[in-house]
Structures are given as C-alpha cells and as structure tokens.
C-alpha cells in the first residue's frame, strides 16, 4: 500500500530520492476506445466523454501512478481550431482545460497522486508566429491551471527546445514547480540542438525536472536522457531527470521518431513492448538516476504497473493493481495446463523473444523522413479544413518520396 497522510509535493519527493511514477498514454488509449479522433488528437473527450477519461485515470492510479496529468495534450486554442477542428468554436479551450483539471483532481484525491497541468507544442510555433503570440497561447492554459490549483506543471512533447523554453518561462510565472520534456532522440531537437544543450536551456529557463517523452522507445529515451544528464553535469546545472517514452519498439525510426514510421498511427501493434520490457526500462532508468519514470503513447496501465512492481523494493510497497498480478508470472502456477504452469518463472519471460505471428512481417521499416520542420510550407497551419487539392498534392509527394 502507498503511504498515508498529507501528500508531499513533487520536488519534496524527488529531493528525497523517491521514485515518482508518471501515468501513461491518453490520446492513443482513448482513440482505440473510440473517444479521441486520430489526426487532430485533441482532448475534447474531457468534456464530451468525461467518464472515459476518468476511468483511464483510475486505471493508471491503481497501477501505481503518482501523477495524474490533466488530459490537456494539444488543448491550446490554436490547436483546437486547426484544420477544421470544431472544438474551439463549439466547446472552447477553457472548458476543455477546466474539465480535464477537475477530472484529474477527482481521481488524484482517491490516492497518493499529484495533479500536473500540461501544455504541449503549438501549431502557431510551427507557423513561425512570434514569441509573444506563442507565449500568449500557453498563458491561457496556465490561467486555468492556476484557477484549478494543480500541484505542478509540465511542458511536454516539444520538438524544438526554443518553444519548450518559452513554455517553461510562462509556466514559471505560476510559482509552481515545472517539469519539461522534449520528444527528441539522441540526435537532438529538430534544429540540431544536442540533448545536453537542450537540458541545460530548459533548466536555466526554470525547469526543475527535465527529460524526454514520446516519439521514441524506452531504451532510446534512456540513451537520450543519459546525454542530457552529461550536459547538465558539464554545465554544472542541477535538475531532476524524467522519462516518459513510447510503449513501442522504434529502433528503425529517424530523427522525428515514430511519426516517420509507415505504421504510424494505425498499424503499430506489432511493435508494442511487453511488460517485461518495461521492467528492464524501469531498472535502467533508475540506475541512471532518473526518479520521475512514466510513459506516453502506447503505455497502458499494465505497463505502468510493471514500473511500480520493478521498483517496489525501492518504494517499499506494491500498487493496488498487483493484487491481481503474480510477480513475474507467478500466477500461472494456477493454470490448468502444465506447459503454461511451467512458465511461472522470471527467467522464462526475461529470455523469451516474442514472435509477431506474422509470417511476412518485416522486422524493420523504412521511415518516411520528409525532413520538414518549423517554417516549411507543408507545416504552415490553417483554421480551414485541409482541402482535397492539398491532399492530392501530399499523396503525389508521398509517392515520389517512397520511390
């Protein structure tokens, strides 16, 4: 059982060397359940289907998560009206952000969890809007987070450290702790800034916790955080480390991560990591000195539970979800079939290389790698829906780049 009593804050926990377990992926999980639209990936489900969002929060809490991130990924006003999205006009960004905060707080109060208000990269930045304009967008979300009194703030899912720094500077105005994660790999951000330099810039901007999230698999994210740590040490700048990777294997992706893979987003299932992969990830992250350990897209509650179970010796307790889960498959000793009972042991699962079950499935893919980033014509955003001619042009370009 988790400790009882008054909740300690994020920095109080991290400064004491405690492990803070983040939650998992919401947009992918809720898209598969029928509550989020793939493409815009916006979080209007917080208003339209609050029971679905609430239930997913509860499952992550039961699995051992110490943090309930508000379901505010891509909840900036410009994203909610981008390319024909109806949310900004019919619901409003303020209502989405407020509802997400209320749901996260309700569930966090059911356990030893903190509420984190989150912002992410914006269409405005990709369209080369000014620093003042982009910061104004973040500030609208921050106003809601302050009103709802979240426990700390996260700037997550940024491909460019420049925009992430702008977000951190705005979030620091609240006086609350700020964490910041980039969706980058070992090659650095899309402007070529190294992971080490990215970490230093984020920390100097005011982030108390820095790291990575999304776009890459667990072990790639650990490699990136290692470079961040080295950069911080070299610059003599202090910050806690965090990592919230994908739950997909991505050894073949390029600099932009899994969104470059041909399977994104509807055919990623063969790449899903096992719970045993997550045991290894949690241990590697802990040994590196990372103390905020969670997940992003593809991370389901059973992945979060694997983190909590792997680090139970350090934390001193198991999550409630472990009541129905035997350690390293030990519950299989109750199975009716003897060959399945024989799998009730750690070394079996650690040594197993899972098969895909697809005879003609390649082990690797060729990333699309269009190489576009901020300022490119194809990334300039618009309020109007994508036109048929724009799609025809993109289809033609895809054919050329695939040959």
Swiss-Prot record:
<feature type="binding site">
    <location>
        <position position="296"/>
    </location>
    <ligand>
        <name>Zn(2+)</name>
    </ligand>
</feature>
<keyword id="KW-0862">Zinc</keyword>
<keyword id="KW-0808">Transferase</keyword>
<keyword id="KW-0963">Cytoplasm</keyword>
<keyword id="KW-0479">Metal-binding</keyword>
<dbReference type="GO" id="GO:0005737">
    <property type="term" value="C:cytoplasm"/>
</dbReference>
<dbReference type="GO" id="GO:0008270">
    <property type="term" value="F:zinc ion binding"/>
</dbReference>
<comment type="pathway">
    <text>Amine and polyamine degradation; betaine degradation; sarcosine from betaine: step 1/2.</text>
</comment>
<dbReference type="InterPro" id="IPR036589">
    <property type="entry name" value="HCY_dom_sf"/>
</dbReference>
<protein>
    <recommendedName>
        <fullName>Betaine--homocysteine S-methyltransferase 1</fullName>
        <ecNumber>2.1.1.5</ecNumber>
    </recommendedName>
</protein>
<dbReference type="InterPro" id="IPR051524">
    <property type="entry name" value="BHMT"/>
</dbReference>
<comment type="function">
    <text>Involved in the regulation of homocysteine metabolism. Converts betaine and homocysteine to dimethylglycine and methionine, respectively. This reaction is also required for the irreversible oxidation of choline.</text>
</comment>
<dbReference type="GO" id="GO:0006579">
    <property type="term" value="P:amino-acid betaine catabolic process"/>
</dbReference>
<dbReference type="GO" id="GO:0009086">
    <property type="term" value="P:methionine biosynthetic process"/>
</dbReference>
<feature type="binding site">
    <location>
        <position position="214"/>
    </location>
    <ligand>
        <name>Zn(2+)</name>
    </ligand>
</feature>
<dbReference type="InterPro" id="IPR003726">
    <property type="entry name" value="HCY_dom"/>
</dbReference>
<dbReference type="Pfam" id="PF02574">
    <property type="entry name" value="S-methyl_trans"/>
</dbReference>
<feature type="binding site">
    <location>
        <position position="297"/>
    </location>
    <ligand>
        <name>Zn(2+)</name>
    </ligand>
</feature>
<comment type="pathway">
    <text>Amino-acid biosynthesis; L-methionine biosynthesis via de novo pathway; L-methionine from L-homocysteine (BhmT route): step 1/1.</text>
</comment>
<feature type="domain" description="Hcy-binding">
    <location>
        <begin position="8"/>
        <end position="311"/>
    </location>
</feature>
<dbReference type="InterPro" id="IPR017226">
    <property type="entry name" value="Betaine-hCys_S-MeTrfase_BHMT"/>
</dbReference>
<dbReference type="GO" id="GO:0047150">
    <property type="term" value="F:betaine-homocysteine S-methyltransferase activity"/>
</dbReference>
<keyword id="KW-0489">Methyltransferase</keyword>
<dbReference type="GO" id="GO:0032259">
    <property type="term" value="P:methylation"/>
</dbReference>
<comment type="subunit">
    <text>Homotetramer.</text>
</comment>
């Amino acid at each position: 059982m988790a400790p009882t009593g008054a909740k300690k804050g994020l920095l109080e926990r991290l400064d004491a060397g405690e492990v803070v377990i983040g939650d998992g992926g919401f947009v992918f999980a809720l898209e598969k359940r029928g509550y989020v639209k793939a493409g815009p990936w916006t979080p209007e489900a917080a208003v339209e289907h609050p029971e679905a969002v609430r239930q997913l929060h509860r499952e992550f809490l039961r699995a051992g998560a110490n943090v309930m991130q508000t379901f505010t990924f891509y909840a900036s006003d410009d994203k909610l009206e981008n390319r024909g999205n109806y949310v900004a006009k019919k619901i409003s960004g303020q209502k989405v952000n407020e509802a997400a905060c209320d749901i996260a707080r309700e569930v966090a109060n059911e356990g030893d969890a903190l509420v984190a208000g989150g912002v992410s990269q914006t269409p405005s930045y990709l369209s080369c809007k000014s620093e003042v304009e982009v910061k104004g967008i973040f500030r609208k979300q921050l106003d809601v987070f302050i009103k709802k009194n979240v426990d700390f703030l996260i700037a997550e899912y940024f491909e460019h450290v420049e925009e992430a720094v702008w977000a951190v500077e705005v979030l620091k105005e609240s006086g609350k702790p700020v964490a910041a994660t980039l969706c980058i790999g070992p090659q650095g951000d899309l402007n070529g800034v190294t992971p080490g330099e990215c970490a230093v810039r984020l920390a100097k901007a005011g982030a108390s916790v820095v790291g990575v999230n999304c776009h890459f698999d667990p072990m790639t994210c650990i490699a990136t955080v290692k470079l961040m740590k080295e950069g911080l040490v070299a610059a003599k700048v202090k910050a806690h480390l965090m990592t919230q990777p994908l739950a997909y294997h991505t050894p073949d992706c390029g600099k932009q991560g899994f969104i470059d893979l041909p399977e994104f987003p509807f055919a990623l299932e063969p790449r899903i990591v096992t719970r045993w992969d997550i045991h290894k990830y949690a241990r590697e992250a802990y040994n590196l000195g990372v103390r905020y350990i969670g997940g992003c897209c593809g991370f389901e509650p059973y992945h979060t539970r694997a983190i909590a179970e792997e680090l139970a010796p350090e934390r001193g307790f198991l999550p409630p979800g472990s009541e129905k889960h035997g350690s390293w498959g030990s519950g299989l000793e109750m199975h009716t079939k003897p060959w399945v009972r024989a799998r009730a042991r750690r070394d079996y699962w650690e040594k197993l290389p899972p098969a895909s079950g697809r005879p003609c499935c390649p082990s690797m893919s060729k990333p699309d790698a269009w190489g576009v980033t901020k300022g490119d014509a194809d990334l300039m955003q618009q309020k109007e829906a994508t036109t048929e001619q724009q799609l025809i042009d993109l289809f033609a370009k895809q054919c050329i780049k695939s040959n």
